[in-house]
C-alpha cells in the first residue's frame, strides 16, 4: 500500500509541473505573437530605382547576375546549364585590364600567362585545351582568325567579357571543347555620358581615350555612343613597341519599347603590336654556365628576334 501510494504521488508531481510550464509558455508566445502581428508594418515607397540588368548591357555592380552566353537568352547566371564567368566593366576598370586575356586572370579553369607578358594574341587555355584556337565571339558573331591573324579586341571598348566552360557545339557549332569566350561591346545609351581619360607610366606609356554617349532627340528614339583610344608603350624587350589606335562609333534606333536596332562598328589600327615570343628557362630562371665555369643570365630586355620581326594588324568590323 505504501509503495503504491508513493508511486501515485510521484507520478502526479512529475506530470503536472511540466504541463503547467508548457501551458504558460504557449500562452506567453501566443500573446507575444499577437503583439508583434499588430505592430509589424511593412511599407515600400515606389521610386525610379536602379535600371534592371540586361545580359547585353552594363552590370550595376562588380558581380553580374545575368548572362546570355550559356543559353543565348537573357538568363540569370544561376539558371545557366553550364559554368559561366562574367567580368564586368567595373571589374576591368578596377584591375586596369589592357587585354581580353588579362580580364580572365582571376577566372578559374583558365590559363592566361603561357605567352608571358605579350598581348599580341589573346591566348587562353581553357580546361587544358589549346590556347590559340579558343573560339571568341563578339556581340554574338564569331571572330574568325587563327594564330597570327587572330583578333585582339581592346577591353576599353567592352561592357563585359564572359567565359563559358565545357563543350558547347550545340549552341556554337564547331568549337574548342574547353569552352568559348563571349565579348559584349559598349552600346548606345540614352543617358548622357562624357568621359575623357589620360594615362602615363613606365616604359614611355602614353594613353588617351574618350567615351561619349546620349540621346539624339527628346524622346530617346535615337541614341549614340562614340568611344576612342590611342595607346603607345615601349615593350620590355629591345626593338619592340606597342601602338594601338581604336575608334568605335555606334548608333541605336528604338521606335517603341519592344524594338531596338543597333549599328555597332569597330576600327583598330596597330602599326606595332609589341613582342611576341618567349625565352627558355636556361638563361632566365637559371644561369648559363660557360666553358670556363663562369655563369651569366640573359638581360631582361633581350630579344631573340631580328629587327624585321614585327607584326602589324588592322581590324575592321
Indicate residue ranges for each PLM-predicted region.
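Acidic/polar loop-and-plug regions of large Gram-negative outer-membrane beta-barrel proteins
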Residues: 231-235, 247-254, 258-317
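Outer-membrane beta-barrel translocator/receptor signature
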Residues: 156-159, 170-247, 253-260
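Transmembrane beta-barrel architecture of outer-membrane proteins
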Residues: 87, 95, 121, 145, ...
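Transmembrane beta-barrel outer-membrane domains
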Residues: 117, 151, 201-205, 240-244, ...
Amino acid at each position: 500500500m505504501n509503495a503504491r501510494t508513493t508511486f501515485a504521488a510521484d507520478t502526479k508531481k512529475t506530470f503536472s509541473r511540466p504541463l503547467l510550464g508548457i501551458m504558460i509558455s504557449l500562452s506567453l508566445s501566443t500573446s507575444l505573437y499577437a503583439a508583434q502581428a499588430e505592430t509589424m508594418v511593412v511599407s515600400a515607397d515606389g521610386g525610379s530605382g536602379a535600371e534592371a540588368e540586361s545580359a547585353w548591357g552594363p552590370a550595376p555592380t562588380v558581380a553580374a547576375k545575368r548572362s546570355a552566353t550559356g543559353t543565348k537568352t537573357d538568363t540569370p547566371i544561376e539558371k545557366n546549364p553550364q559554368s559561366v564567368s562574367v567580368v564586368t566593366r567595373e571589374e576591368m576598370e578596377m584591375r586596369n585590364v589592357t587585354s581580353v586575356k588579362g580580364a580572365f586572370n582571376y577566372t578559374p579553369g583558365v590559363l592566361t600567362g603561357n605567352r608571358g607578358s605579350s598581348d599580341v594574341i589573346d591566348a587562353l587555355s581553357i580546361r587544358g585545351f589549346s590556347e590559340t584556337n579558343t573560339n571568341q565571339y563578339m556581340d554574338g558573331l564569331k571572330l574568325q582568325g587563327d594564330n597570327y591573324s587572330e583578333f585582339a579586341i581592346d577591353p576599353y571598348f567592352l561592357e563585359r567579357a564572359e567565359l563559358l566552360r565545357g563543350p558547347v557545339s550545340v549552341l556554337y557549332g564547331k568549337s574548342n571543347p574547353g569552352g568559348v569566350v563571349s565579348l559584349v561591346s559598349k552600346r548606345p545609351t540614352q543617358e548622357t555620358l562624357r568621359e575623357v581619360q589620360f594615362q602615363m607610366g613606365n616604359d614611355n606609356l602614353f594613353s588617351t581615350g574618350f567615351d561619349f554617349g546620349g540621346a539624339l532627340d527628346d524622346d530617346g528614339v535615337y541614341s549614340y555612343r562614340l568611344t576612342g583610344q590611342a595607346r603607345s608603350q615601349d615593350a620590355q624587350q629591345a626593338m619592340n613597341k606597342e601602338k594601338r589606335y581604336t575608334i568605335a562609333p555606334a548608333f541605336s534606333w528604338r521606335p517603341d519599347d519592344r524594338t531596338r536596332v543597333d549599328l555597332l562598328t569597330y576600327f583598330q589600327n596597330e602599326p606595332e603590336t609589341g613582342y611576341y615570343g618567349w625565352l627558355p628557362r636556361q638563361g632566365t630562371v637559371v644561369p648559363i654556365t660557360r666553358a670556363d665555369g663562369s655563369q651569366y643570365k640573359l638581360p631582361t630586355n633581350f630579344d631573340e628576334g631580328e629587327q624585321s620581326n614585327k607584326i602589324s594588324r588592322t581590324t575592321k568590323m
